[in-house]
């Protein structure tokens, strides 16, 4: 298996971590189906990855829809004839703004709460569900979910009453699937970023916000999207085949 061209689906592929993950996998010659809800950003991803040795196909889809998730898996198999792993990067806070963090409970509507779970948990669940038959048939597959440090503790300015429980659910989903699917040859792991240095973070929240998080790191710097992508790639690639059910914190030493 180590010598064949690997094929992956990356969801949220037009965002910061998702885009960096797609680039990292393509740089090693993999086939990647990049999935995102934004056609415009997918076009930018294609342009950005045009010179990389791997083959990129893109697909616009809302993965909170079961039909869409099933269609994405089917498209990957139709285009590439194979699927080795999925990076479930799609997620985040809904309609994020400068004052999104730690918003009062009274401002958390049920619709927003459910949309946050749909974006973070439903998408990962549905992709795993529809990839399982293919993975089981070949006796091999890898799923990497993206959780957050916000899943583990009360942390100021890292989420809200909808986002933090959703990311905790991603951890629970990861651990449950690893046990349920492991004897079928399917490995399921997750990464847990803290605040990730990206253009969007700096533009949305400003320098003072970034500096407060920077002060809490053990390394004196924040993780970058490329750091998160490297961790995801490690968990997708063959060198991590003995690992399942783990959550890897990629957060510059923040516990």
State what each model feature region is.
Residues 2-33:
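Canonical Rossmann dinucleotide-binding motif of NAD(H)/NADP(H)-dependent dehydrogenases/reductases
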Residues 140, 221-250:
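C-terminal substrate-recognition "lid" of short-chain dehydrogenase/reductases
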Residues 133, 179-180, 241:
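Alpha-helical segment proximal to the catalytic Tyr-Lys
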Residues 182, 187, 243-245:
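Short, small/polar-rich loop/turn modules that mediate ligand/substrate recognition or access, typified
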Residues 97-114, 213:
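Substrate-binding pocket helix/loop in short-chain dehydrogenase/reductase
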Residues 28-45:
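Conserved glycine-rich Rossmann-like NAD(P)H-binding loop of the short-chain dehydrogenase/reductase
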């Amino acid at each position: 298996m180590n010598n064949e061209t690997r094929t992956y689906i990356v969801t949220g592929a037009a965002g910061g971590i998702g885009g960096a993950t797609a680039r990292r996998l393509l740089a090693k010659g993999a086939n990647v189906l990049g999935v995102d809800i934004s056609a415009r950003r997918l076009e930018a991803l294609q342009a950005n990855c045009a010179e990389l040795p791997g083959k990129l196909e893109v697909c616009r889809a809302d993965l909170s829809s079961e039909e869409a998730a099933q269609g994405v898996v089917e498209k990957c198999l139709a285009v590439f004839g194979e699927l080795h792993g999925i990076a479930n990067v799609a997620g985040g806070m809904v309609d994020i703004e400068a004052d999104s963090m730690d918003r009062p409970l009274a401002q958390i509507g049920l619709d927003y709460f459910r949309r946050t779970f749909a974006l973070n948990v439903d998408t990962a669940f549905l992709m795993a569900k529809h990839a399982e038959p293919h993975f089981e048939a070949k006796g091999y597959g890898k799923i990497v979910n993206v959780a957050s440090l916000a899943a583990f503790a009360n942390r100021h300015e890292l989420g809200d009453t909808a986002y933090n429980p959703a990311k905790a659910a991603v951890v629970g989903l990861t651990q449950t699937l690893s046990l349920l699917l492991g004897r079928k040859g399917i490995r399921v792991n997750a990464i847990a970023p803290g605040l990730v240095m990206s253009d969007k973070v700096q533009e949305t929240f400003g320098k003072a916000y970034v500096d407060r998080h920077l002060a809490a790191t053990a390394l004196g710097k924040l993780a970058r999207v490329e750091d998160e992508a490297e961790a995801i790639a490690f968990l997708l690639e063959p060198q991590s085949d003995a690992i399942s059910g783990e959550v890897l914190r990629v957060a510059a030493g923040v516990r």
